[in-house]
Amino acid sequence: MAAKDVKFGGDARQRMLRGVDILADAVKVTLGPKGRNVVIDKSFGAPRITKDGVSVAKEIELADKFENMGAQMVREVASKTNDKAGDGTTTATVLTQAIVREGAKAVAAGLNPMDLKRGIDKAVAVVIEDLKANSRKITNPSETAQVGTISANGESEIGRMISEAMQKVGNEGVITVEEAKGIQTELDVVEGMQFDRGYVSPYFITNPEKMIAELDNPYILIHEKKLAQLQPLLPLLESVVQSGRPLLIIAEDVEGEALATLVVNKLRGGLKIAAVKAPGFGDRRKAMLEDIAILTGGTVISEDLGIKLETVTLQQLGTAKRVLIEKENTTIVEGAGSPDDIKGRCSQIRAQAEETTSDYDREKLQERLAKLAGGVAVIRVGGSTEVEVKERKDRVDDALHATRAAVEEGIVPGGGVALARASLKLADLGYDNGDQKVGIEIIRRALQSPLRQISENAGEDGAVIAGKVLENGTYNFGFDAQTGEFKDLVSAGIIDPAKVVRTALQDAASVAALLITTEAMIAEKPEKKAPAGAPPGGMGDMDF
């Protein structure tokens, strides 16, 4: 086991604080509409330019092990806030730095760190209640667009697109962000349920120009095993032919005699039919087939349930208004499933997503939820250069998460004002002893730091701006750093999601309190490397 280096008390806290400051100073320059960019060197390719706090935080690794521990703790704050709310990482970093700075001074002055922590926790609880009381629900698409615009650093086109996407696919819908090939940023919406499997054979195509198969008002057979023999299918095919409606077969695979006969019938015009493979693999495939069955009002034909293909009736088939089948995708539009069944299935998937510990599983469950709930929107981000596209994509991701958070828990005035106003609520908060009072005071000061930082990034004096904002009793009154004016921020469209502000404060206070109560730090001693040996001597007349 390698030897360890141990630091105690003030020495440990000082080193840790240096690490916190290095990381926070690099991140906080990005805060607000006039925040600056940070350029990050890459081991290959062009450097990356970003204004996204968490992207900057993730790149910072310090040589001194003790400083690095402080920096990594703040990085953890940014990551956690990003995971929970998707935005607010820079605000969380600024708050952490402010709380740790003041807290370290208080501990150095001999105050009890545990009482400081209790005071901090008390104050945070009061502020969160104040944020909840003052947040208001989003009522129209223009407010949704404003949240997106603020989070995308004032780019209104991004805000408008996100608002439009959410209108089309609903708040539960999946909105993915991709890099576009051209200069334009565009929105593409796929309504209905889409899965990534296309036709089994190109002979099923009905529209040769577009290379797609279109089925109007089809029956849908959902079968979890392979279809190789035609015999079990015959009774069902006869019923479908008599009904005069098309048939879509979704099965693990369709091959051999079954496929050949279906293709021949399709070409002769006797039967409008198409077959696609079932989406997903293993247990996920079963779950997705069940989703399709619920969406279309059908039944999964499975031997587990004791249903044999020979006995299937038309009542056990699903139906939909329209099905589009491309080479690699199938879209089911307006399935005929009962809305109550679909809602029930959505609740079940939502519960699974909350319980799972795997990010991958959660992402897949959310995709399934979106497909059931209404559709998928894709925002393709364009730009003149690759670096610009990546930078804009970061901002679109932030804006998307912020908008979702705003729909969830409502909005508060932006520009750091909601936290600054909440600091006034701490003036007469009760405490058990003097040290707790100092903890409350630490939070009271820290709550003004985001407002001050936004003002300083815009070239103003942070203390003066904070003073003017708090002198005015109107809750929504604040400083618009973009124009340099004081105004009603909510009516000017400068708003933050309450969830983002709440999460930033909770995560910052949690980690900062841990840093303040640290008394010892342990790190591995760097190994002393032996000096390299001298090169061998030359041989005789060999000149180099």
UniProtKB/Swiss-Prot annotation:
BP GO terms, sorted = protein refolding
Pfam families in the cross-refs: Cpn60_TCP1
Leader sequence range is: none
The lineage's top-level taxon is Bacteria
Which EC class does it fall in? isomerase
Q: Which reaction does it catalyse?
A: ATP + H2O + a folded polypeptide = ADP + phosphate + an unfolded polypeptide
Name the Gene3D superfamilies for this protein: GroEL, GroEL-like equatorial domain, TCP-1-like chaperonin intermediate domain
Q: Which CDD domains match?
A: GroEL
Q: Name one GO molecular function term.
A: isomerase activity
Q: Which residues bind ATP?
A: 30-33, 51, 87-91, 415, 496
Please provide, in alphabetical order, the Gene Ontology terms of the cellular component aspect for this entry.
cytoplasm
What EC number is given for this enzyme? 5.6.1.7
Q: Which UniProt keywords apply?
A: ATP-binding, Chaperone, Cytoplasm, Isomerase, Nucleotide-binding
Q: How does it assemble?
A: Forms a cylinder of 14 subunits composed of two heptameric rings stacked back-to-back. Interacts with the co-chaperonin GroES.
Q: Give the family, as the similarity comment puts it.
A: Belongs to the chaperonin (HSP60) family.
Q: Which HAMAP family match?
A: CH60
Q: List the NCBIfam families hit by this protein, alphabetically.
A: GroEL (TIGR02348), PRK00013.1 (NF000592), PRK12849.1 (NF009487), PRK12850.1 (NF009488), PRK12851.1 (NF009489)
* Function recorded in the entry: Together with its co-chaperonin GroES, plays an essential role in assisting protein folding. The GroEL-GroES system forms a nano-cage that allows encapsulation of the non-native substrate proteins and provides a physical environment optimized to promote and accelerate protein folding.
What is the protein name given in its UniProt record? Chaperonin GroEL
The species this protein was found in: Granulibacter bethesdensis (strain ATCC BAA-1260 / CGDNIH1)
